[in-house]
């Protein structure tokens, strides 16, 4: 059967006719019917594209998102079977996005123009027009007419979602999909659409997960994530996603995007551009800074600085800014964390920066102190670095910072690091005070650690910082609040000794009392949790005191050594328990093997045989499954080889048809895509080499010919040059003579004019002063007149504005009074109509009541008549007619004739109804 004949121009003509008569909805529906019809499967997609473009223009103009979505999905369904159809889908999608962005820009410009229009002389949102906007339907005050823009924003966002879902996970539409993703992110950034950006990020993750899932299936046009170009596009999308997340302030979404980028970087074999990677590390540093992770913030800034050095447009001011920021970020890192047991979450975050382990503060400081970075930092930053990285004296710290902080406050990069630097400085001041003072008044301690602005803290905040330092095991102290004295301790086990003795005495007294009251009982010893911990700490203290260097170490070093020893002991306990468990498992296995040497019963033999048969059966089934998998794999390999051979043959024919190189088609069977690329490159390189050799020979030949020409032309050119030189010298001399003569004449004329003017110059000055004096009063009069006119114009304008506002107020009041009178008339009319309606209802009700009573009376009369009729057996005798002459007497045997029957009188309708009702009763 031949395909149907399509006339796309007729559909466009029909749509234009409907639009011209004011029926755009009908035009849109007609185009939708044409696009969704199955006939277009047989058409060339390029011929259908104008109809789809017209359909999109109408749909965007009418804001019919659902209709557009249905049309695009149906169009893709009909044309996706061919590569040309998918290209058409990409072109249609790009056109749709262009239309919606253009429309969104025009609507936004229109809204901005409406907001910028001044409503009165004051303009803007004033208290008066705010009150007016409450009761007026036309809320034209700026800031109240954003609903139209919001609806277009929602429509634009739904359009982006539709296009992304239309293009997702198709290898032929990857480039278009990537472009739409970038434009969608720019849309969210431009209009500050945070919620839409979150949904966009989730959608992109779902698309990537679907692409990963499709890798296991052999579908047509599946996205190949092993392709470097495809993977690079996904990576660029995620890096842009990180950038937009940071600009929008979506830090959680930025962190999730960083995870996506790290995953894609681990899969990629191609390094990103240094500029892109530098921007990525800069955004990562911002994310870590917001999360108060100053350690990784500094590492990320260091990686950014290393990449930024490759920027050819970077200036010395930029290097100074970023170097100073990097040094401050390193100084903001808190003291090196003490060893912890278990999983450290920072180890995973360090993996995002391609670090094998979590760095320490000392390592970061050492890297920052490199001359390339430190030498470019500002001088105040260098001084702060030298101050905080030395064992400063708490007594002189305040004076040093007082002269240094004002210089740093003027730097833009210093503000964001004030809080972490303050925390680090105060904590280090407490550590220094704990080393310098054994005990000190609380007020004196706060006086020593009170730093100048912006490092100043209240006494309550200082006490909180001191307690936080103790909780983190950087200092240990006891506070006597009665005396207001703080006592620092140099040994972390110092409090343990006193508390141990006290608790031991308490336990001894409790044990004595228990024995006195329960002499006959012998309870088992019970170790409480506190006593067990205390015992373990005492043993740890004894072991550490025997360690070299422990007695003379600082408090922090002692805590670090204690924690390392605890970690070592815990690891030893875990290893011993693991070894014991393995030993128990080996013992159980040995006992099982030993028990198997006992002679078995007949039942056990049968069970063993059945078990063996079951195992053999399972092994046979496993072999059969493995064989089936092997055959399926071989079949799949053969199919792939056939497809590869067909593809290679097609590519070889295409490359041979171009005529640049020739490849034997017989080699298609043993050729892969990589071999084809390599062979093509080799052949092209060989042809290029031959061409280069021929071109080089030709260039040499042309060079020799040119040399011969120039050798013959050289004497002629020399003669011509000598003649030209003589002609130029002659022309120069003539021109010089003319210029000298003209200059002399001009000079003489100027001297003559000067002599004439010098004679009349005093007269000119006298005349000038006379004219100025004469015109001065006139000028002042004109100025006064103009000032009066200006004042009169101002007053007239003010009066006009007041009169205009007064007229507007009078008109508004008249409108209000007219509206009120109209409402009163309407209300009176309504009341009158209500009264008339009630009166009619009352009259009708009375008539109904009278009719009911009349009906009851009639029914009673009818019942009475009926009873009377039933009580009388014969009808009443009618009166005889008037007497006539008596007839003659008849004989006795003569029969008397009976009178003729009288005709019955007809009953009326009312009488019939009465009789019928009486019969029913």
UniProtKB/Swiss-Prot annotation:
Residues 319-493 form the PCI domain. Pfam families: eIF3a_PCI_TPR-like (PF22591). Residues 562-647, 693-868 form a coiled coil. GO terms for molecular function: mRNA binding; translation initiation factor activity. This is Eukaryotic translation initiation factor 3 subunit A. Residues 873-890 have a biased composition (Pro residues). It comes from the Eukaryota.
């Amino acid at each position: 059967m031949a395909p149907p004949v399509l006339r796309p121009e007729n559909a466009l003509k029909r749509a234009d006719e409907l639009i011209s008569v004011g029926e755009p909805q009908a035009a849109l529906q007609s185009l939708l019917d044409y696009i969704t019809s199955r006939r277009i499967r047989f058409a060339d997609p390029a011929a259908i594209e104008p109809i789809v473009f017209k359909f999109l223009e109408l749909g965007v103009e009418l804001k019919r998102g659902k209709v557009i979505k249905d049309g695009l999905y149906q169009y893709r369904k009909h044309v996706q079977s061919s590569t040309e159809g998918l290209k058409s889908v990409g072109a249609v999608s790009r056109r749709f996005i262009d239309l919606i962005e253009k429309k969104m820009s025009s609507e936004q410009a229109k809204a901005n123009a409406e907001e910028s229009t001044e409503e009165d002389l004051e303009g803007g949102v004033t208290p008066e027009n705010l009150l007016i906007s409450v009761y007026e339907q036309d809320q034209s005050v700026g800031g109240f007419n954003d609903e139209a823009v919001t609806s277009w924003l929602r429509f634009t966002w739904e359009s982006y979602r539709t296009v992304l879902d239309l293009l997702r996970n198709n290898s032929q539409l990857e480039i278009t999909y990537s472009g739409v993703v970038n434009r969608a992110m720019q849309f969210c950034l431009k209009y500050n659409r945070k919620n839409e950006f979150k949904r966009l990020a989730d959608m992109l993750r779902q698309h990537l997960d679907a692409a990963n899932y499709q890798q296991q299936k052999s579908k047509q046009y599946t996205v190949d994530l092993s392709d470097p170009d495809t993977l690079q596009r996904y990576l660029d999308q995620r890096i842009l996603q990180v950038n937009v997340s940071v600009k929008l302030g979506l830090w959680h979404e930025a962190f999730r995007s960083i995870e996506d980028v790290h995953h894609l970087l681990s899969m990629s074999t191609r390094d990103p551009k240094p500029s892109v990677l530098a921007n990525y590390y800069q955004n990562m540093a911002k994310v870590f800074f917001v999360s108060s992770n100053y350690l990784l913030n500094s590492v990320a800034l260091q990686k950014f600085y290393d990449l930024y050095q490759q920027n050819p447009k970077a200036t010395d001011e930029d290097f100074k800014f970023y170097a100073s920021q990097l040094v401050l970020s390193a100084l903001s890192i808190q003291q090196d964390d003490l060893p912890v047991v278990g999983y450290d979450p920072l180890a995973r975050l360090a993996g995002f920066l391609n670090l094998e382990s979590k760095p320490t503060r000392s390592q970061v400081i050492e890297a920052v102190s490199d001359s390339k970075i430190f030498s470019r930092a500002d001088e105040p930053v260098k001084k702060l670095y030298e101050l905080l990285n030395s064992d400063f004296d708490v007594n002189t710290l305040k004076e040093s910072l007082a002269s240094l902080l004002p210089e740093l406050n003027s730097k833009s990069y210093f503000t964001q690091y004030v809080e972490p630097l303050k925390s680090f400085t105060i904590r280090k001041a407490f550590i220094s005070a704990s080393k310098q003072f054994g005990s000190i008044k609380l007020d004196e301690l706060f006086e020593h650690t009170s730093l100048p602005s912006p490092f100043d803290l209240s006494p309550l905040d200082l006490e909180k910082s001191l307690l936080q330092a103790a909780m983190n095991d950087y200092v240990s102290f006891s506070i006597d609040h009665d005396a207001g004295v703080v006592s620092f301790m140099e040994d972390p086990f110092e409090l343990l000794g006193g508390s141990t003795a006290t608790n031991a005495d308490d336990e001894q007294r409790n044990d004595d009392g228990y024995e006195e009251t329960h002499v006959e009982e012998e309870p088992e010893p019970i170790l409480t949790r506190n006593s067990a911990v205390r015992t373990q700490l005492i043993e740890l203290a004894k072991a550490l005191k025997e360690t070299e260097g422990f007695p003379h170490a600082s408090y922090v070093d002692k805590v670090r050594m204690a924690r390392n020893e605890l970690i070592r002991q815990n690891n030893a306990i875990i290893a011993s328990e693991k070894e014991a468990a393995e030993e128990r498992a080996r013992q159980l296995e040995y006992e099982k093997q030993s028990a198997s040497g006992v002679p078995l019963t007949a039942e056990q033999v049968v069970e063993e045989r059945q078990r063996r048969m079951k195992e053999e059966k399972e092994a046979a089934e496993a072999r059969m499954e493995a064989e089936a998998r092997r055959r399926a794999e071989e079949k799949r390999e053969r199919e792939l080889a056939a497809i590869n051979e067909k593809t290679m043959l097609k590519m070889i024919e295409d490359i041979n048809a171009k005529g640049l190189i020739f490849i034997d088609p017989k080699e298609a069977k043993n050729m892969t895509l990589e071999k084809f690329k390599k062979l093509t490159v080799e052949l092209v390189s060989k042809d290029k080499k031959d061409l280069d050799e021929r071109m080089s020979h030709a260039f040499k030949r042309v060079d020799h010919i040119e040399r011969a020409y120039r050798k013959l032309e050289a004497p002629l050119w020399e003669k011509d040059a000598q003649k030209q030189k003589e002609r130029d010298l002659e022309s120069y001399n003539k021109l010089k003579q003319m210029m000298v003569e003209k200059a002399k004449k001009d000079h003489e004329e100027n001297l003559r004019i000067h002599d004439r003017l010098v004679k009349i110059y005093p007269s000119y000055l006298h005349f000038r002063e006379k004219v100025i004096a004469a015109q001065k009063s006139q000028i002042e009069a004109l100025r006064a007149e103009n000032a009066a006119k200006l004042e009169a114009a101002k007053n007239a304008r003010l009066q006009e504005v007041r009169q205009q506002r007064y007229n507007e107020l009078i008109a508004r009041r008249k409108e209000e009074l007219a509206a009120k009178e109209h409402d009163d008339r309407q209300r009176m009319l309504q009341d009158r109509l209500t009264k008339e309606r009630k009166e009619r209802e009352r009259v009708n009700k009375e008539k109904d009541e009278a009719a009911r009573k009349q009906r009851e009376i009639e029914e009673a009369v009818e019942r009475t008549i009926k009873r009377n009729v039933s009580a009388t057996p014969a009808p009443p005798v009618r009166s005889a007619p008037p007497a006539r002459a008596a007839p003659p007497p008849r004989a006795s045997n003569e029969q008397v004739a009976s009178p003729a029957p009288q005709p019955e009188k007809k009953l009326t309708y009312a009488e019939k109804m009465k009789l019928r009702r009486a019969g029913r009763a």
